[in-house]
Amino acid sequence: MSPQTETKAGVGFKAGVKEYKLTYYTPEYETKDTDILAAFRVTPQPGVPPEERGAAVAAESSTGTWTTVWTDGLTSLDRYKGRCYHIEPVPGEEDQFIAYVAYPLDLFEEGSVTNMFTSIVGNVFGFKALRALRLEDLRIPVAYVKTFQGPPHGIQVERDKLNKYGRPLLGCTIKPKLGLSAKNYGRAVYECLRGGLDFTKDDENVNSQPFMRWRDRFLFCAEAIYKSQAETGEIKGHYLNATAGTCEEMIKRAVFARELGVPIVMHDYLTGGFTANTSLSHYCRDNGLLLHIHRAMHAVIDRQKNHGMHFRVLAKALRMSGGDHIHSGTVVGKLEGERDITLGFVDLLRDDYIEKDRSRGIYFTQDWVSLPGVLPVASRGIHVWHMPALTEIFGDDSVLQFGGGTLGHPWGNAPGAVANRVALEACVKARNEGRDLAAEGGEIIREACKWSP
């Protein structure tokens, strides 16, 4: 071997497995305004120190691997590595802790939720040194927020388009969700809109099945919209689900909706994917369409307490990717603690600036600067007797989305819609007059029934 190519044992670095905390646990680190901050709930394997597990999360979700590699010398790890900068125990849990990780902004592609999630949660959740891992919250820095378009239009522009102010918007999901012909589907849409609803909705799994192809559904729903608008003098809409097997097909359906002149389309953003959702959001802004977002599949990700991601993270990601509405669930009949947590991420959807508040599950102060807000959609098992609570809890900037609570009315679809509208207007009027909706809600609804046709 020539002297030029001879490898000397004393040259290079010491290979082998090294503790992550030696490089990635930095409690002295002061976070920067440009860092993306993450709060992970960590459940480690027995016998592993919290500092090592927190550092492992930071390493495996940024620049690290299980050993030192020679190409580490070709870059600046101090500039690009994630850092576990704080660890705190989870109250009431002996084997869990919250690891706070800071990521330099240069690790992420501008305007890409897909890349952000691929980096932060794409690999580390399968790490065998952890029993479970949950991403509880993210702080998105202003510098990164400004690289996103966000919702196509936002709350105020939507109200201006619809010319509807001072109350929540009313919607209804057409049931049965599967099996209706396009013509019968359009009939149900017309009856609900004519009865007083602002919107009707495709169910999340209505795409283009053999019993009802998408183009037929779009045509009959557009007819229902225009007929109900002519008869009521109000602007109406139906969430036409543009979700499809390819991005190209999705955009084709959105183009057809625009050509029909309808005001809004819909997308299943988790099953459809963030890249598809961002593409559709950009199309909707460029072409004047509102965008309703359904969160189908969210419980696969957010239901487990110890593993996955909290919905507040998915809600923040949606605001960045783009959507004018998103289903947020409802707190009616739930525990008070769940109510506070739900309203925490509802505020993250609507407000420009949200202070850190751990009692509501908000781990970081979030500044959205000028990014438009998203209307939360309260849905799932609600009916007119929930209207006082829904009006009080969600306020005016929301969509109250019924299904069986409209279509299950014993007199039919249109009377069900009338009941929804009468109950809502009665509750809004009572609230504006200073009445206590929590205490007097039932009486308010019964009074309204006397005057409802």
From Swiss-Prot:
GO CC entries:
chloroplast
| Name listed for the protein in its UniProt record | Ribulose bisphosphate carboxylase large chain
Instruction: List the SUPFAM superfamilies hit by this protein, alphabetically.
Output: RuBisCo, C-terminal domain, RuBisCO, large subunit, small (N-terminal) domain
How cofactor binds (record note)?
Binds 1 Mg(2+) ion per subunit.
Q: Where in the cell is it found?
A: Plastid, Chloroplast
Active site annotated at which positions? Answer: K175, H294
Q: Where does Mg(2+) bind?
A: K201, D203, E204
**Where does this protein chiefly localize?**
plastid
The major lineage groups are:
Eukaryota, Viridiplantae, Streptophyta, Embryophyta, Tracheophyta
Q: A GO molecular-function term, please? A: monooxygenase activity
Q: Where does substrate bind?
A: N123, T173, K177, R295, H327, S379
One record GO biological process:
photorespiration
Keyword set, alphabetical order: Acetylation, Calvin cycle, Carbon dioxide fixation, Chloroplast, Disulfide bond, Lyase, Magnesium, Metal-binding, Methylation, Monooxygenase, Oxidoreductase, Photorespiration, Photosynthesis, Plastid
The protein's assembly and partners: Heterohexadecamer of 8 large chains and 8 small chains; disulfide-linked. The disulfide link is formed within the large subunit homodimers.
Q: Which reaction does it catalyse?
A: 2 (2R)-3-phosphoglycerate + 2 H(+) = D-ribulose 1,5-bisphosphate + CO2 + H2O; D-ribulose 1,5-bisphosphate + O2 = 2-phosphoglycolate + (2R)-3-phosphoglycerate + 2 H(+)
Q: Under which main EC class is this enzyme filed? A: lyase
Q: Which positions are listed as propeptide?
A: 1-2
Question: What extra comment accompanies this record?
Answer: The basic functional RuBisCO is composed of a large chain homodimer in a 'head-to-tail' conformation. In form I RuBisCO this homodimer is arranged in a barrel-like tetramer with the small subunits forming a tetrameric 'cap' on each end of the 'barrel'.
Q: Which gene encodes it?
A: rbcL
Note the InterPro entries from the entry.
Answer: RuBisCO (IPR033966), RuBisCo_large_chain_AS (IPR020878), RuBisCO_lsu_C (IPR000685), RuBisCO_lsu_C_sf (IPR036376), RuBisCO_lsu_fd_N (IPR017443), RuBisCO_lsu_N_sf (IPR036422), RuBisCO_lsuI (IPR020888)
